[in-house]
Amino acid sequence: MDGLVELIEQKKKRQSKSRDSDVNGTLPVETSPSANWFSQMSTSKSNKKVPLSSVTSIIDGLKRLYIQKLKPLEVTYRFNDFVSPLLTNSDFDAKPMVMLLGQYSTGKTTFIKHLLKSSYPGAHIGPEPTTDRFVVVMSGPDERSIPGNTVAVQADMPFNGLTTFGTSFLSKFECSQMPHPLLEHITFVDTPGVLSGEKQRTQRSYDFTGVTSWFASKCDLILLLFDPHKLDISDEFKRVISSLRGHDDKIRVVLNKADQVDTQQLMRVYGALMWSLGKVLNTPEVARVYIGSFNDKPINEHVIGPIGKELFEREQEDLLSDLKDIPKKACDRRINEFVKRARAAKIHAYIISHLKKAMPAMMGKAKVQQRLIDNLGDEFAKVQREFHLPAGDFPNVDQFREVLSGYNIDKFEKLKPKMIQGVDDMLGYDIPDVLKKFRNPYD
């Protein structure tokens, strides 16, 4: 842990030096010339487009490209209603986030306390399901807890998109702020324990899986925590893991509290965990599993022996090195997520315009709309063949159908080739030009 804090301090010093130079990869929020872009309509003819030659960093360049080329496409084809809310200034300037997921009492809150070496406002620990809300642990001038409704409307925080989940969720969401050197570079998301019973799951007053998916798209690392005594993956946990589709590169598995079993039992537990994950993670690659006991107590060497202690220490070092790399990779992750979003918006535009094209001009619109909704999978296949798109990039059919049923397809826009070409140019030329011009601030 000392090495993690030292590295953060070194990077902090390098950042303060790099602010004096002309070229850097980050943009302070207070001096950003683009602070008011998101309050303006980019599609207005009176607005003059700012040339990309005047950008001052990679993040600045992504902001301008989003406003000028990607946001008009998203607004035209209602991407924000179907897939993801429109991005705001704070989404680009946000610190890297790490989300912890797992069943109750697998050590999620204790894990954060272990990294911070102190408790945080609103932290509750116990053998029963203690964390009953989503808690964002981030840097702040003093220790305090901010209610979810307040957090969601603050322009300088990247949580405006959570308003789509309603007041019932926001009452189960809060932000915990405290001054800490680690939190100046990384934000943690503590989640409620995933429930094992179907009855308890249905009593949640909000879309738990949807909220998890929203956070997954914003996070830089997702830690799935397991307890040696809780290896079963419940139906809700399966749905949660399935909602992480498309973010496989962010997922790490942590077998926590592993010093509660001896070496022979640990081998069996590890095998059972890998078997369970193999049925849920639909990927041929093997997920990275860290074994250890991530709390402030000394490792129970009496149970696991000297070999187990050495293994746990090395595993902990590997996990900490993964966490150390997060700020360094944050800029690359922003670019990666931006490109993924642009491709998703393009495919969404193709789908919406295809459905609009299939509608009749005069009679029988209601019947045709119902047929299109019922056979949405076939329509996706037609779009895929027409535009030569990868099948894996298409949205979930059932979720898309659920949202689509509330709209009048005839009101959708036809395909606008100029907008599509603008996004293609952005992916093919503008983003590579920005990357050539600026460097990662942590390099």
List each language-model region with its residue ranges.
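Short linear motifs centered on serine/threonine within intrinsically disordered regions
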Residues: 12-21
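Alpha-helical interaction elements in eukaryotic regulators
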Residues: 54, 58, 62, 107-108, ...
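C-terminal end of P-loop GTPase domains and the immediately downstream helical coupling element
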Residues: 258-259, 264-442
